[in-house]
A protein has these predicted regions:
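A charge-rich, low-complexity, intrinsically flexible signal that marks solvent-exposed coils, linkers
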Residues: 1, 45, 65-66
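Negatively charged, low-complexity tracts enriched in Asp/Glu with abundant Ser/Thr
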Residues: 1-9
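Histidine (H) residue identity feature
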Residues: 3, 30-32, 64
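Active-site microenvironments of metalloenzymes and redox enzymes
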Residues: 58-66
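A short, structured beta-strand/loop element
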Residues: 11-55, 59
Length: 66
């Protein structure tokens, strides 16, 4: 997965601390998620599933977990 271009949120620590999730677009419909402090562990999902999750997060469906 070294060929992937990983993207962090603009809300991540600007000083480069390992405190965020990173996303990358893979081949076809694959989307990848990893933690910046443990980049060797990667979760792979589809664009549709990731979109559904992000929309739920924006709507506050997971606020009770933070």
């Amino acid at each position: 997965m070294s060929h992937l271009v990983w993207q962090k949120s603009s809300y991540s620590d600007a000083e480069g601390a390992d405190n965020c999730l990173e996303l990358a677009q893979g081949n076809g419909d694959h989307r990848h998620v990893r933690e910046s402090d443990n980049p060797s562990v990667v979760l792979t999902t589809t664009a549709a599933k990731l979109r559904t999750f992000i929309l739920g997060a924006r709507a506050g469906e997971f606020d009770h977990l933070i």
